[in-house]
Amino acid sequence: MRSWDLSDHEVEPQKPQVLGTAEEGRAVLLSLAAGDSMPDHQVRERAVVVVVSGQLAIEAADGERVTGGAGTMVVFEPSENHAVHANEDSRFLLLLAPWSLEEHSSLDPWSPED
């Protein structure tokens, strides 16, 4: 078993910290300073965003918007465009699934990347 205290784990704004990777998925902890954004983008995998602290405004390409604090969870289907904006200093967990180890063969399963 491995565990993390996501509210206290070291992560700098705009510098994602990969917590682990396996074929079942990838876990990434991110931090955004108040006013910072991740502009409209997409990923091949299903993306699950879980707000750990702060407040995020998360918007889908169709204009649907969710604003929420700690405990808010938003799910995007594969290739669904979305954007994230920090209304205040925020950290959030991003889960990507499934994660193809074949396509990302240089990664060691469930080992942090340096």
PLM regions: where:
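A short hydrophobic beta-strand segment most commonly corresponding to one strand
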Residues: V75, E88-H104
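Short acidic-glycine-tyrosine-enriched beta hairpin
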Residues: D62-S79
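A short, N-terminal "cap"/entry segment at the start of jelly-roll beta-barrel domains
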Residues: M1-V28, E59, G69-A70, D108-D114
